[in-house]
């Protein structure tokens, strides 16, 4: 980002730099004495050389030495002159010894390790020489600065990015910002701030506003890009220390990704400039950091944010005439957890579609919730409806109660005040238990379709790790990615994590219970719907089961249920002959098996060019039985000719 963009300034700075080079040439040649007075300057902003001198507090000799290194890069004859004077014409570089002998106010401290020229890497010494004889080169970043281009060092561009102070803030976050700015103004020399919580966008927006308050840019370093201890860290510290002064800028360490904490702590403890940290957890990296919590606004505040964002882009007449909008805003505020910036973006995206405003808002909210979770879980497109689900009436009633509560959370939790004492335990969590194929995943599809939400399947057996602490990290990744809340999460194979509790005999047992507790805690806090499935409910500890909001048993279907499943398994447009659902129901199979048999039988019929028949279904049933290693009794397929 350039701060010297004006053409008038650029030309004046070039002329000033050329005059400085001419002055240095007279010092090297001894043709005449340097001018006594300051060079003329008519711009409001000082020349780049003067800015650089002030930033790094350079002495007159250090300034001249730096300008000499710049001069040999920009004017070939000066490089040749230095080569002749040093007796090494092939190098065309100045040396410290040359500067000490020909320039006024010589000072050996100018190239001491702690001097600005060395500490901030403004100049580089060619290795293999003594201090006085070493050829000197100006760093490329500094050369461009002197020439009037203030752009971030190329070595930092791949790991740092600018964060403009343009994102809107929720009311609570604005109040926190105002308080932080008062504290910062009182102690500007000790700004070291850690913002933690579940709203990373708001944390970045607050940090950008703090930087703006002090006339600084904000640059973000993601935790996974943090340099490892050693040479990488040393180079980063040197380059960043310089960059923070040149741009100028504050650094925000974005600790929402994965990174070795040792690397982050080493960076936080050693960085010599203002440091801001953003993370989900409150674990401390730096002993001098002030810590403040920044979470997503509660549903009531989110509703106000939606109203404000829509009012800014949609005509009032359209908002007032949209009867569905109030209900939609209630559902969105309770279902999704979004930053003020995301809400403003979604509102702007639908502003030109007033006829379907409520529906477009909802679908856009779903879309922005997907990207991170798509990388970690399987997204299932829910197509099932209540008629596809064959369950006893009591179990169906529990599922419909879950849907009803999910739809009416805003009314009960916020309008009626049930969330006023805290939101712990208010998440929509459920346990689905029953043999494989009895409809647990199908029921999750029905719920997702009814709530108009995406369904994501997470295989807990793949999440669980034998390494201590890794399972919790894997679960954290999933829930953090789903934080915006607009999804139904289906955790399959709960028994992989939830065994019956036993006495804690070693660290593995203790960590297993910690991991179970962590999963339940995140489910209780989750803004969407979280479902655990298990084939063996008895293997789950009762204490864990009690923490789940709903529990639905999926029994093995009886004959009447199997007949209903068969009737649903074969589409009405399928050519068929002699299909008898009552006889088919004699076969003791689950709904999942029945659907597999119907599908395989249809392919058998299609291959022969005949309508689907009972014989096709018997052949497919034998294939399914062989796959599941379950023998079929003769009575089960009697009459399937």
Task: Explain the meaning of each model-derived region.
Residues 360-363, 367-368, 372, 382-384, ...:
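AAA+ P-loop ATPase central domain
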Residues 161-178, 381-411, 588:
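Dynamic helix-loop-helix/coil hinge segments at AAA+ ATPase domain boundaries and subdomain interfaces
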Residues 371, 375-379, 391:
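Long, low-complexity segments enriched in small/aliphatic residues
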Residues 74-75, 334-363, 367, 586-615, ...:
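AAA+ ATPase "lid" subdomain C-terminal helix
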Residues 1-313, 323, 331, 624, ...:
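Intrinsically disordered, low-complexity N-terminal extensions of AAA+/P-loop NTPases
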Residues 174-322, 396-400, 404-584:
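Walker A/P-loop NTP-binding motif of AAA+ ATPase domains
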Residues 320-336, 345-346, 380-384, 498-500, ...:
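Short conserved motifs of the RecA-like P-loop NTPase core
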């Amino acid at each position: 980002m350039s701060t010297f963009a004006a053409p008038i300034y650029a030309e004046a700075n070039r002329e000033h730099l050329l005059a400085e080079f001419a002055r240095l040439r007279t010092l090297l040649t001894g043709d005449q004495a340097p001018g006594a007075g300051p060079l003329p300057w008519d711009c409001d902003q000082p020349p780049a050389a003067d800015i650089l001198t002030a930033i790094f507090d350079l002495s007159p000799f250090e300034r001249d030495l730096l300008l000499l290194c710049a001069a040999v890069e920009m004017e070939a004859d000066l490089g040749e002159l230095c080569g002749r004077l040093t007796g090494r014409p092939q190098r065309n570089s100045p040396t410290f010894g040359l500067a000490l002998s020909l320039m006024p106010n010589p000072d050996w401290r100018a190239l001491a390790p702690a001097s600005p020229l060395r500490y901030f890497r403004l100049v580089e010494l060619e290795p293999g020489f003594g201090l006085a004889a070493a050829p000197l080169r100006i760093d490329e970043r500094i050369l461009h600065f002197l020439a009037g281009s203030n752009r971030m060092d190329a070595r930092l561009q791949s790991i740092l990015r600018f964060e403009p102070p343009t994102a809107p803030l929720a009311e609570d976050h604005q109040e926190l910002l105002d308080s932080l700015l008062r504290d910062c103004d009182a102690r500007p020399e000790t700004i070291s701030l850690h913002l933690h919580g579940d709203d990373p966008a708001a944390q970045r927006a607050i940090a950008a506003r703090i930087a703006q308050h002090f006339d600084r840019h904000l640059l973000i370093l993601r935790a996974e890009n943090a340099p490892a201890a050693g040479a990488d860290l040393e180079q980063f510290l040197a380059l960043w220390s310089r960059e923070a002064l040149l741009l100028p800028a504050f650094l925000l360490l974005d600790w929402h990704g994965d990174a070795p904490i040792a690397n982050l702590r080493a960076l936080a403890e050693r960085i010599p400039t203002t440091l801001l940290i953003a993370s989900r957890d409150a674990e401390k990296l730096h002993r001098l950091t002030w810590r403040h919590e920044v979470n997503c606004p509660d549903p009531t505040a989110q509703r106000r944010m939606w109203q404000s964002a829509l009012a800014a882009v949609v005509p009032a007449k359209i908002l007032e005439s949209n009867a569905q909008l109030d209900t939609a805003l209630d559902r969105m505020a309770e279902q999704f957890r979004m930053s003020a910036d995301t809400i403003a973006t979604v509102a702007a995206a639908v502003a030109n579609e007033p006829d379907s405003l409520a529906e477009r808002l909802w679908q856009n909210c779903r879309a922005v919730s997907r990207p991170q979770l798509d990388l970690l879980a399987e997204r299932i497109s829910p197509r099932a409806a209540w008629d596809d689900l064959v369950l006893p009436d009591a179990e169906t009633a529990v599922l419909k109660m879950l849907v009803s509560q999910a739809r009416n959370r805003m009314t009960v939790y916020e309008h009626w005040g049930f969330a006023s004492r805290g939101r712990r335990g208010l998440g929509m969590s459920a346990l689905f238990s029953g043999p494989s194929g009895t409809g647990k995943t199908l029921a999750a599809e029905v719920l997702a379709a009814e709530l108009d939400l995406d369904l994501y399947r997470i295989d807990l057996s793949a999440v669980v790790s034998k390494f201590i602490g890794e399972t919790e990290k894997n679960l954290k990744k999933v829930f953090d990615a789903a934080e915006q809340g607009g999804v139904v999460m289906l955790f399959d194979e709960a028994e992989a994590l939830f065994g019956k509790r036993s006495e804690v005999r070693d660290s593995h047992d203790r960590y297993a219970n910690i991991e179970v507790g962590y999963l339940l805690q995140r489910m209780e806090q989750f803004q969407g719907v979280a479902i655990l499935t298990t084939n063996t409910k008895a293997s789950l500890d009762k204490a864990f089961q009690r923490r789940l909001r709903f529990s639905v048993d999926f029994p093995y279907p009886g004959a009447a249920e199997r007949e209903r499943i068969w009737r649903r398994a074969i589409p009405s447009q399928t050519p068929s002959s002699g299909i008898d659902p009552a006889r088919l129901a004699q076969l003791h199979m689950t709904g999942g098996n029945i659907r597999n048999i119907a599908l395989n039988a249809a392919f058998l019929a299609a291959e022969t060019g005949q309508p689907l028949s009972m014989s096709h279904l018997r052949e497919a049933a034998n294939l399914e039985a062989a796959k599941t290693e379950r023998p079929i009794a003769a009575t089960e397929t009697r009459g399937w000719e």
